[in-house]
């Protein structure tokens, strides 16, 4: 499932912030905040969608449950999301615990080929002991686990790995994102431009002033009508996308148009109806 990528990403982020130890609870909170925008804004399924319509991915279920419990918007900040998780921690507890069953242990599986000892994946206590033994006798692992249970279980980052991760954080996170995008695109083939839908785009990158200036010059020489109302554009107006930005993920000129400011917010991210709006759009 996709949350293995979010598990690794959360650990790298915590280490880059100077953390030397954490807990399952803290790491999973970080995972929820990292997955929040994609799931909420674009309805991306982290591990595909089965025929029965049930959500397979535990991390996606956690995001959707927090959505039901809170009133947070899709572009809520990490601080806001973590505050909401804390507020509804009791209600989220069972869903969060499900994320601890396999991934924290399986994420280290690649290292265990160095040992001939058989790994018992069915017992958290035995896996914890095996990880500690392997780390001591065979090879230093990125992290080992403490003896507490469930969400309270400690995660101790190893010093040899901390320095390497801090020195190469950007490259490691870039690799994780690359692998994450490949996984998500395979599971969401109907979603275009998925690489641009993992985190909110900074508004300062999307400045539309020059587009507004161009439309203003056009309106000085010919009449432009609002695509949705058919009324001449006069007074206050917004510049917005005919096909919502969340679908095309760009600000190309062909898709930008003046629009009645009072209608812009109500249009939201819904696709406009082909008839009669496309004809109006083309005539402008």
Label for each model-derived stretch:
Residues 3-6, 221, 228, 251, ...:
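Generic recognition of stable, solvent-exposed alpha-helical segments in well-folded globular domains
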Residues 230-258, 267-280:
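Histidine-centered nuclease catalytic patch
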Residues 16-19, 219, 234, 247, ...:
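Hydrophobic/aromatic-lined pockets within catalytic cores
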Residues 209-238, 260:
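Short cysteine-rich loop/turn motifs with clustered Cys
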Residues 1-207, 211, 276-284:
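Mixed-charge, low-complexity interaction segments
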Residues 1, 216-219, 246-250:
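Short, charged/polar micro-motifs that form catalytic or ligand-binding hotspots
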